[in-house]
């Protein structure tokens, strides 16, 4: 085996293997996004004795104190169950960094530490991956810890994932809780549609994202941050928009209303109606009243807000391994149409149609108590019967130790001065 720099083609060919647990940051398209952010990129990996790539990682080189911080965001990509391979990678990476002006290195691999069901019950027969964590420590890495909160300096360590392998949309939907099934069916009955936005329509996503940001008060990303991905990731970034055409909905409602009124009139025309028939008529009367009310509201909404209402939108990344929900927004004013549910259901079906076995709802804090900052987010994802995946976390290692000590000391002083 040999540790070496890789070409873009070598890197790309390797990470296209769907059996490898790889992240959308470890794709060739991310080279340009990192360069757009002002960082150099280097591709490092391992080749076996037949010159075949068996490990790969995309590193950003972040200029710091006359040296570089080497950061492989969600790397490296390899068979991490092969501890011998991981050991060799870490040993040879250290040698490389010693020769290439590295201040310190940060790795946050997309590697599983433990696996749980939706209720945070560990999967039977699964063990915590302490061997991997201990291997990193044996190479001088500091583990950032088994965190259970969001940290703006780190990628998420907990995720909610739908495993689609061996399932169909129908069998999967049966595993959802009653609220998820009911709301998806509501959206379908409303006639909510989903389409992918073109790059020049991305402002429609941003409008919904900014509305949600203001409503929820979360830390948002800039427009430029999103456009960096939109402009470079090509077909690896997907932006669905859930919307409703009120003209079509009104027409559908009118047809249903006409049908119910005709059935009611036919039943009323019969003589000597039984109690059972009278109950059916009473039920139809309720449905007719409801439909008339809905028809009036939809007609008024179309007049004031226009016939097309944008309900929800999201940014997704698709790589060889999975489809990953990155960020989203929705309109609170139109929440009765269940736009977010239809968007997720559409994208889940997209996975089935395109051969993906994983639909990743992505980030959770890891605190699953009712008082946690994202308990509502957890409940939403839990309702889809996700499996909870815990990743091994962040690892740091100083390479230039004297300069690293100076760097951390100055950083502590800066933080004290800010208080």
Curated annotation (Swiss-Prot):
A Pfam family per the record: FemAB
EC number: 2.3.2.18
Catalytic reaction(s) noted: MurNAc-L-Ala-D-isoglutaminyl-L-Lys-(N(6)-tri-Gly)-D-Ala-D-Ala-diphospho-di-trans,octa-cis-undecaprenyl-GlcNAc + 2 glycyl-tRNA(Gly) = MurNAc-L-Ala-D-isoglutaminyl-L-Lys-(N(6)-penta-Gly)-D-Ala-D-Ala-diphospho-di-trans,octa-cis-undecaprenyl-GlcNAc + 2 tRNA(Gly) + 2 H(+)
Enzyme class per UniProt: transferase
Primary location group: cytoplasm
GO cellular component terms, semicolon-separated: cytoplasm
One GO BP annotation of this record: response to antibiotic
Cell compartments where the protein resides: Cytoplasm
GO molecular function: aminoacyltransferase activity
SUPFAM superfamilies (UniProt xref): Acyl-CoA N-acyltransferases (Nat)
Spans traversing the lipid bilayer: none
Family: Belongs to the FemABX family.
Quaternary organization: Homodimer. Interacts with FemA.
Name of the protein described by the UniProt record: Aminoacyltransferase FemB
């Amino acid at each position: 085996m040999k540790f070496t720099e890789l070409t873009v083609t070598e890197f790309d060919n390797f990470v296209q293997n769907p059996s490898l647990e790889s992240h959308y940051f470890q794709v060739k398209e991310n080279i340009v996004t990192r360069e757009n952010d002002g960082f150099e990129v280097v591709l490092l990996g391992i080749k076996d004795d037949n010159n075949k790539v068996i490990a790969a990682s995309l590193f950003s080189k972040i200029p710091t104190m006359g040296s570089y911080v080497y950061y492989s965001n969600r790397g490296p990509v390899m068979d991490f169950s092969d501890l011998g391979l991981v050991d060799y990678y870490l040993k040879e990476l250290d040698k490389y960094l010693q020769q290439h002006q590295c201040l310190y290195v940060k790795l946050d691999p997309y590697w599983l530490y433990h696996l749980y069901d939706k209720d945070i019950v560990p999967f039977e027969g699964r063990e915590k991956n302490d061997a991997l964590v201990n291997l990193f420590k044996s190479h001088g890495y500091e583990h950032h810890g088994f965190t259970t909160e969001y940290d703006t300096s780190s990628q998420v360590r907990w995720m909610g994932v739908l495993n689609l392998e061996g399932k169909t949309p129908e069998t999967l939907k049966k595993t959802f809780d009653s609220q998820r099934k009911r709301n998806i069916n509501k959206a379908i009955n409303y006639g909510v549609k989903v389409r992918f936005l073109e790059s020049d329509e991305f402002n429609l996503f941003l409008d919904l994202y900014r509305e949600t940001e203001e409503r929820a008060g979360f830390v948002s990303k800039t427009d430029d941050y999103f456009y960096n991905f939109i402009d470079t990731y090509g077909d690896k970034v997907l932006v669905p928009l859930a919307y409703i055409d009120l003209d079509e909905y009104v027409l559908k409602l009118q047809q249903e209303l006409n049908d119910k009124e005709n059935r009611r009139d036919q039943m009323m025309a019969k003589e000597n109606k039984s109690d059972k028939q009278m109950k059916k008529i009473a039920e139809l009367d309720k449905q007719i009243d409801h439909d008339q009310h809905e028809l009036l509201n939809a007609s008024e909404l179309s007049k004031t807000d226009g016939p097309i209402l944008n309900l929800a939108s999201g940014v997704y990344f698709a790589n060889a391994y999975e489809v990953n929900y990155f960020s989203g927004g929705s309109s609170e004013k139109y929440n009765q149409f269940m736009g977010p549910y239809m968007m997720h259901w559409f994208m889940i079906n997209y996975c089935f149609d395109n051969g993906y076995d994983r639909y990743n709802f992505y980030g959770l804090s890891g605190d699953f108590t009712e008082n946690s900052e994202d308990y509502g987010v957890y409940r939403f994802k839990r309702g889809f019967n996700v499996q909870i995946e815990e990743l091994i976390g962040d690892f740091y290692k100083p390479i230039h130790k004297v300069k690293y000590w100076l760097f951390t000391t100055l950083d502590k002083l800066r933080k004290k001065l800010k208080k």
